[in-house]
Amino acid sequence: MPLRLKIILVMSCLWTALSCAADNYDANPSAQVVIDELVVEEGFDREQLIAIFAQAERKDSILNAIARPAEKTKPWYEYRAIFLNDKREDQGVEFFNRYRMELDRAEREFGVPAEIIVAIIGVETSYGRVAGSYRVIDALSTLAFDYPPRSPFFTSELKNVLILSRDQGIDPMSLMGSYAGAMGYGQFMPSSYRNYAIDFDNDDIVDIWNNPVDAIGSVANYFKQHGWRTGEIVVSAATAAKSTPEAIFVKNRKDLHPTRTVAQFAAEGVVAEIKLDPEALATAMKFEQKEGYEYWLGLHNFYVITRYNHSAMYAMCVYQLSQALAARVAR
C-alpha cells in the first residue's frame, strides 16, 4: 500500500475516533460533576456511571428539535390540526372502549374525567403508537450538557432517570423516549415517573412504557396531585372587545397562572359565553385563526392541564380532544 494512502487511512481512523469520543460524555466536565454527586448523594458505583456516560451520545437532532417546538413555531389553526382530526379521534374512541373499565376506575379513584386521561395519552403519543425514538440517556445527556438555557432542569432529569433505572432494575440504555427525554404512553419525565407513576393493575410493576393501564392510573394521579377539581368547568369560549388591552392575554408560560377574576376580565372586555362565577380566577387566551382570532377564558382546571405541558395551545388541544371523545363515547 502506498505510504500516502496509509497516512490518509490512519488519519481518517484517528479523526473518526476523536469525533466519536467528542460525541460521548464520560470525559465531559459537567458529566463528571453529575457522577460525583450521584456517587456521594445516591450511593452509585462510579465505574458504572462512567461506563454509562461513555455510551451516551450527543445528538444534534435533539438540539434542533428543542429549538423549534410546534407550539412556538405554528399558529393555533395549524397546531390544532395536528391533534384534532378524524384519525386521532377514531383511535381515541378505540382506546376508550378497550380500557373503559380501567378508565372508569381511574375517574372514580382520582376524580379526573376519563376523557381527559385519554386525551392526554392521545396528544402525547397517539395512544402509545408514537412514544419516541431517542434513547432517553442520549436525550437528557445532550440537553443537560449541551443546551445551556435549560441545563439545570435536564441535569436534574438525567439524575432522576439514572436513579429510577437503578431502583426499578432497568438498563438505562434501553429506555426510549422523546427528544426531551419524556417516556411512555403519557410521556412522563423521569422526575414525574418517580413522583406520580403508579402500579394501577396491581402486578407490582410500575410500567408506563408497555402497560396502558399503569399509564392511565399514572396520568390520573398526576392530575389529582396537581390539584384537579372534580366537576369544575375547565374553559369557556369568550368574546373580546376591540378596546381589550393585549397585555391581559397569555403570552408565555409565566402568564398561565390565573391571577384575575372573571369579573375583572369582563371589565376589560373579555366576556365568557357561558355563566361563570364572577370571582373565579381565570386566564384570557387569544388564538390565531386563518382569519382573525378566537378567545377563551381558562379556569383552574385548565391551569392544571398546563402543568403537564406549559403551553396554552397544548392544554386547549387536550381539552378539545377530550370533548370530541366524550361526545362520541357512550358512557
PLM regions: where:
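Bacterial N-terminal signal peptides
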Residues: 6-17
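Secretory-pathway/luminal and periplasmic proteins that interact with or process carbohydrate-rich
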Residues: 58-65, 125-135, 146-151, 167-173, ...
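Acidic, glycine-anchored loop motifs typical of Ca2+
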Residues: 199-208
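Substrate-binding/active-site groove segments that recognize
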Residues: 136-146, 183-198, 219
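An acidic, Gly/Ser/Thr/Pro-rich helix-cap/linker signature
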Residues: 23-107
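Acidic helix-start/capping segments at beta-turn-to-alpha-helix junctions
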Residues: 49-70, 121-125, 135-138, 237-245
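Short, functionally critical alpha-helical segments immediately adjacent to catalytic or ligand/cofactor-binding
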Residues: 50-58, 113-128, 161-162, 219-220
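C-terminal soluble interaction/assembly domains
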Residues: 241-331
